[in-house]
Amino acid sequence: MPRIMIKGGVWRNTEDEILKAAVMKYGKNQWSRIASLLHRKSAKQCKARWYEWLDPSIKKTEWSREEEEKLLHLAKLMPTQWRTIAPIIGRTAAQCLEHYEFLLDKAAQRDNEEETTDDPRKLKPGEIDPNPETKPARPDPIDMDEDELEMLSEARARLANTQGKKAKRKAREKQLEEARRLAALQKRRELRAAGIEIQKKRKRKRGVDYNAEIPFEKKPALGFYDTSEENYQALDADFRKLRQQDLDGELRSEKEGRDRKKDKQHLKRKKESDLPSAILQTSGVSEFTKKRSKLVLPAPQISDAELQEVVKVGQASEIARQTAEESGITNSASSTLLSEYNVTNNSVALRTPRTPASQDRILQEAQNLMALTNVDTPLKGGLNTPLHESDFSGVTPQRQVVQTPNTVLSTPFRTPSNGAEGLTPRSGTTPKPVINSTPGRTPLRDKLNINPEDGMADYSDPSYVKQMERESREHLRLGLLGLPAPKNDFEIVLPENAEKELEEREIDDTYIEDAADVDARKQAIRDAERVKEMKRMHKAVQKDLPRPSEVNETILRPLNVEPPLTDLQKSEELIKKEMITMLHYDLLHHPYEPSGNKKGKTVGFGTNNSEHITYLEHNPYEKFSKEELKKAQDVLVQEMEVVKQGMSHGELSSEAYNQVWEECYSQVLYLPGQSRYTRANLASKKDRIESLEKRLEINRGHMTTEAKRAAKMEKKMKILLGGYQSRAMGLMKQLNDLWDQIEQAHLELRTFEELKKHEDSAIPRRLECLKEDVQRQQEREKELQHRYADLLLEKETLKSKF
């Protein structure tokens, strides 16, 4: 008895690969030919396997909640129409049907109270899968059957054969056509070489013959054109960029190596700057603790004195209330004014709000569909099948309505009545008490109705606001009218200046000046004092000019000399002595610090303070007032004018002043080793070299500083003017192009003008030549006509003779 092969069953990995390769070769229409490669599958099964599992457009991810809700609603609207439902959801029909049955089975388990985590659609041992085309492929066994190996080798051979009978026939026809064309071409060439032209017979084509005509051809207008751009320029091939590493791009290993190198450098810099964080990072701690910043709290709103006053008032009200209770006064006025404020009002239970109970809409819809599926015939009558309340809100995703938070309504002296603290109140809603919530602050005990409940108030309506103001004003007026008449009249009379003093005292008592303002005012006072003190100092100190580090007292002349000093010499000695005293005072109180040692320690200055103090004790320094200094300055100015007139000194020009200054400055030399100035003619060669080296170093420092400053300014100007520069370059290029066009147009204009002149001069000559040629041709034609007539006559004569 022959072996009967029943096609079908579980798909294997080898069969899936053969099916995909066959679809790539034969397409999605020749399923019989594709099935001939698979001995155990039919054409229908191959087609189902492709469209239900192997197609790359099939979605195989987990079902989302929105897709499940959409599936249940569409199944309710279009039952059993899975081919229509599938493209709406984005799944296959088999997937939709399978998941729908899965949801129904899950709902049935829920009704039967069988809470199991297993899939209800899972096959039990011994069951056969009715739809193997929608399941993943089974791995291939290590030892295949002979039939499977034969099928695999046959499929490999057939799929690898791309030259079938039809392909060979097409190739042969193509070769014959090419040989026929070459033979005809060779024949035409040989005939053309023999002097015989054969016109090629072309079949008349409908439409445009693209081999003979140029479609959409636009012939250029007659004239002269620039053909410089049409010249072919050979490309300068850069063979360095055609290397393999340039074509392949940067390798991943090279990029990772560069990144690792950057990380090492970054870690090295981090170790130098921030060692603790680098240690934490290298030890494997990814999230190390940050440095805690200093806690900055706002200033207290209530001072200690005010707090003590509140405590005293509370104690006084408590004593008054106890006195009223002991005396037996229990009227409404006393109970209202003297209310209890010690015990916290716990009218609202301290309960944590529980999570609102939510319902599983997918489970409800599945239960409804299962109940509608199992409903009895309506001929029996009775009640309808009980269903859960549902709607079509699950077709689209649900969005939560967000209310705008209102910080104005969350003030500490207002308790909202609708339980929505900090949200915009909705008009027209019923106020609800705050239930099942833990209060966020101490509830207000407002026995005097100072803060009335206004949760229902609509403050956006101006008419309502005006009405509330009018009612409160009327209520206040009625309350004031109800007050008892005063028993005693008092009149307080203030003195005339008491109001101003009272206002000033109130301002001084209430206003507390800020610490920053106090510091700023003190700093301004100190700056003013410093400026005033600086004005009383010497001009050299005020302008921070270089001053000598040592005082040369040998410039003074001895008093007991022969011959004795004159009055002018004595005056000069007094001036020198005062100058030496001023130098000692400045070196003691205002030592000079060179610009290079501003931040560091001053070297060689201020070390002889004891010497200066001793000298100033014997020769005290006298300070003068501002008026005395002004008088002395006026006297000096007058003396300078007298000397200028007496010496006939005119106005000195800047060139002459600079020349004199350069000559004087060239005679002075600074010795860096001794930190002093001396005359150039008294210095040695070594001192001159050291001085010049110091000057060169200073000049280089100035050059470096100015270069850095210039670089910063250049960078800043480049940022500011970069756009303008690029715009200017673009405009300059456009301007140059326009000038070139103008010159070219001018050159063409001159060329055409010259051409017109030549043509105007040549046209008459051409006309004369043409007229002569025509006249000559006419005469020749007449001669030929006469000759033709003679020949005809001679012909007739000969005919008549013979």
Curated annotation (Swiss-Prot):
The modification Phosphothreonine is found at T227, T377, T385, T396, T404, T411, T415, T424, T430, T438, T442. Residues 118-127, 247-262 have a biased composition (Basic and acidic residues). Residues 200-206 are annotated as: Required for interaction with CTNNBL1. The keyword Phosphoprotein applies. Keywords: Activator, Cell cycle, Chromosomal rearrangement, Coiled coil, Cytoplasm, DNA damage, DNA repair, DNA-binding, Isopeptide bond, mRNA processing, mRNA splicing, Nucleus, Phosphoprotein, Repeat, RNA-binding, Spliceosome, Transcription, Transcription regulation, Ubl conjugation. One of its GO terms (molecular function) is RNA binding. Transmembrane segments: none annotated. It is found in: Nucleus; Nucleus speckle; Cytoplasm. There is a cross-link at K135, K219, K487 (Glycyl lysine isopeptide (Lys-Gly) (interchain with G-Cter in SUMO2)). The modification Phosphoserine is found at S303, S358, S417, S437. Residues 108-143, 247-278, 408-443 are annotated as: Disordered. GO terms for cellular component: catalytic step 2 spliceosome; cytoplasm; membrane; nuclear speck; nucleoplasm; nucleus; Prp19 complex; spliceosomal complex. Residues 408-418, 426-440 have a biased composition (Polar residues). This is Cell division cycle 5-like protein. It comes from Homo sapiens (Human). The lineage of its organism: Eukaryota, Metazoa, Chordata, Craniata, Vertebrata.
